[in-house]
Amino acid sequence: MVTDHSTPVTGRPRVAILFGGRSSEHAVSCVTAAGVMGAIDKNKYEVIPIGIAKSGQWVLASGDTSEWSLSSAALPEVAPSGRTVTLAEVGGEHQLIVTEPNAVPQELGSVDVVFPLLHGPWGEDGTIQGLLELSDTRYVGAGVLASAVGMDKHFMKVVFESAGLSVGPYVAVTDREWSTDAEAVRKRVDKLGFPVFVKPARAGSSMGISKVDSMEGLDAAIDEARRHDLKLVIEAGIVGREIECAVLQGRGTDAPRTSMPGEIAVAVGEHQFYDFAAKYVEDGAAALSCPADMPDEAIARVRELAAVAFDAVGAEGLSRVDFFYTPAGELIINEINTMPGFTPKSMYPQMWAASGLAYGDLIDELIHLALTRKTGLR
């Protein structure tokens, strides 16, 4: 195991913070990066911010967190640049190279670990993870398979069911099914009963999600979800409290660590569920209660099942696992998020803080886990 990850120039491991990306969650990724860059111990790590524009271009970004923070005026966005950043192997080391037209490429030095703070497709779904695996670069978080499964709400449920976890009623709808026989899809949804939640299969931050109370609203909700992904998951509404649990990979062969469960309380008003605005935009629209007001045995069960879900998809580093806690005391798993947000309003760091692990220490532990794990098959 490699133990010395410091660079000869600074004596500190170099951490490339990767954010932005091509998905509809671009702005959320920028806000997450602002949170991490503001809290990371710069006496311990040398931070290199790399933004990915919506075009897919990698650029050397500003380390000024105010440029990436959420404001009421505008959502943050990585702008394209004439200078492109690439990750290449030079002399046996992973080097960041800056290229621009009619100029000699500039070497920025080696990278010890990448922190991919990307949400949604082309970042959280195994694509970036595959690129980093191919380049034999260490990185924070889940690998290719776990990231892909954790991004696809359909196959995620298939894996959960195979692990013995309770999953609510749902139907998966492909582009071909909706395009060739929409009426058959409507009949399948009708059997679920209303209300239902129509969701893009591969999107996060509640992008494109609609609550539908009757058949009359189904087609419009499907059209909205298909703007984000042509594959959909339509779930039966479940009466229950929304309970979340943060999971952190154990060191070495230790079991996953779990936080105290938290409960999401959404303010009554325009929000029928925990949507994008409640998560990121509107102050006071949602609040976390941690630990959740539950019997001790239910709390223990949430933590146990969260660890089962983490292992079921083969997650590494971190994940947030969401459940419904029904009036009958049943725990129904909703989803796993293999790269949960780190914004000031994000639940993952809040739950760990309530469990005794501060934000900066959490970031430090995630980087430690990435630096000390093997590359390649593991």
Curated annotation (Swiss-Prot):
ATP binds at residues 189-244. One of its GO terms (cellular component) is cytosol. Gene3D superfamilies: 3.40.50.20, ATP-grasp fold, A domain, ATP-grasp fold, B domain. It comes from the Bacteria. Its cofactor is Mg(2+); Mn(2+). The keyword Cytoplasm applies. Residues 157-368 form the ATP-grasp domain. It catalyses: 2 D-alanine + ATP = D-alanyl-D-alanine + ADP + phosphate + H(+). GO terms for biological process: cell wall organization; peptidoglycan biosynthetic process; regulation of cell shape. It is found in: Cytoplasm. Its EC number is 6.3.2.4. InterPro entries: ATP-grasp, ATP_grasp_subdomain_1, D-Ala_lig_Van_CS, D_ala_D_ala, Dala_Dala_lig_C, Dala_Dala_lig_N, PreATP-grasp_dom_sf. One of its GO terms (molecular function) is metal ion binding. The keyword Translocase does not apply. Binds 2 magnesium or manganese ions per subunit. Mg(2+) 2 binds at E335, N337. Keywords: ATP-binding, Cell shape, Cell wall biogenesis/degradation, Cytoplasm, Ligase, Magnesium, Manganese, Metal-binding, Nucleotide-binding, Peptidoglycan synthesis. Mg(2+) 1 binds at D322, E335. Pathway: Cell wall biogenesis; peptidoglycan biosynthesis. NCBIfam families: D_ala_D_alaTIGR, PRK01966.1-4. Cell wall formation. Belongs to the D-alanine--D-alanine ligase family. This is D-alanine--D-alanine ligase. The gene is ddl.
